[in-house]
């Protein structure tokens, strides 16, 4: 009898929750900002604290910063609707917009490029030196890795082993430790490396300007769109926002240009294939 009562109460709770208005059912849920894992989780949580606090105050809700072990897992979480606001590079933003109804809001003014880096001493001097060696990148679905792999193919590099790691600072440290001949990182992450790390590295190749980190809002937060956009712009004008943008060399927010995300479709398609979506 006790078992039956528990079962009845459990079903009743589920039914009751389903009958509640949407706002009431999710009233206690925090607003989750999912940051693509371009660097270590510790650094991401620290880096985005000013934004978290500003949005919490502006929206009047609890705000959490979350990330993922790698770009592939991040994409899966975003597709599974784990984030209210996703901050990820243009190719994943395009996927989320085109296939999963996320709404693009803003990107950063600072140029975003993918870099192929090597060490000052002992690294490859040109693309042909990378054949038969190990090159270090982020996950197979990260923009810098996808562009870097295309660059290797265009350059005629053969028999290259790609080793995937979780963060840009790990790429740099592994190169300096002699565990790879070259690596793929973004320009912003390269600029954020410690000066003593940067001096041991050099840029072998760089991409044209690409669409970097884009803020895309989950469709379930459509009613909050105007408030979220206003909060982002006010953050950029606040003292803490200006410090954040200057410290991370981001220059500020800007609106996306017409067709800018659509131009990332070839890279978005590679993510689809990697995730088994086509």
Task: For every predicted segment, state its role.
Residues 100-109, 204:
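A structural signal for short loop-to-beta-strand junctions that line the ligand-binding cleft
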Residues 27-91:
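Extracytoplasmic small-molecule ligand-binding "clamshell" domains
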Residues 1-12:
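Bacterial N-terminal signal peptides that target proteins for export
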Residues 31-38, 44, 127-144:
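Short loop->beta-strand "edge-of-pocket" segments that line small-molecule binding or catalytic clefts
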Residues 62, 141-158, 162, 232-278:
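Ligand-binding clefts/hinges and TM-proximal coupling segments of bilobed small-molecule sensing domains
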Residues 122, 131-223:
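Pocket-lining segment of extracytoplasmic ligand-binding domains
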Residues 72-86, 99-100, 128, 168-184:
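Short helices/loops that flank or line small-molecule/ion binding pockets
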Residues 29-38, 44, 110-118, 196-236, ...:
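Periplasmic-binding protein-like
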